[in-house]
Amino acid sequence: MPAPALKMLAAAQRVLVAKGFSGLTLRAIAQESGENSAMVQYYFGNKEGLLKAMIDSVFRDDQEDAAAAMSTVTSDDRLPRFVDGLRTISSSRSFRVFFDVLPYALRNEGLRSRMARAYDWYRRIKLDWLRAEDQAPPSQKQGLLGLSELMTAVVDGLAIQEAIDDGFDTRRAYAVLEFMLQRSLPELLESDLHGGSRPG
């Protein structure tokens, strides 16, 4: 993406966080970025096109940052770093964008499908962090997929609490999560969850 377009995307994120969805106008983005409003239309077409590009941009940045952070982790450090990576994601700028866009995305097929694809990226990130999907036998893959789905929900929920309460500290909850995973993950992987059955 050309440098002016990237500059406008960054400006759009700042406007969205500061002014909300209703304040995200082409004029506001042009003023924030220092670019002409016609250029915003040239690169993104309209507000929906801009939002799609913004969703792709922030989630892709998170994905790349996460992959870089986990690429050199040893097996002994993998689970603590996995949980720390979840905590980093829940505090990232993408969630401020996510919270503002979500109510509108639920009513817009184009934005909703973009969000769904972003969630698929996040679930894949979590599987990649554990380096588990390719190495796991078929009997474990359902449990790993369920774990990635559950961890995505945990990140969302803690991010909401952090966003609405400046005094909320996610470290306590993530410490509990790490404690639980250290003790339950081996049992989970040994359980056959195919078809929704639960470990006995």
Task: Name each model feature, range by range.
Residues 7, 11-49, 53:
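Helix-turn-helix
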Residues 11-18, 65, 97, 101, ...:
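Solvent-exposed, amphipathic alpha-helical segments
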Residues 41-44, 88, 100-107:
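Short helix-capping/turn signature of helix-turn-helix
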Residues 45-49, 70, 74, 106-110, ...:
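Residues in soluble alpha-helical coiled-coils and helical-bundle/repeat scaffolds
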Residues 53, 64-95, 141-151, 174:
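Hydrophobic alpha-helical connector segments
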Residues 56-62:
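Short, basic, alpha-helical segments at the C-terminal edge of helix-turn-helix-like DNA-binding modules
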Residues 64, 68, 90-99, 109-135, ...:
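Amphipathic alpha-helical packing segments from all-alpha helical-bundle domains
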Residues 123-131, 154, 160, 164-200:
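C-terminal peripheral helix-coil segments that are non-catalytic and often amphipathic
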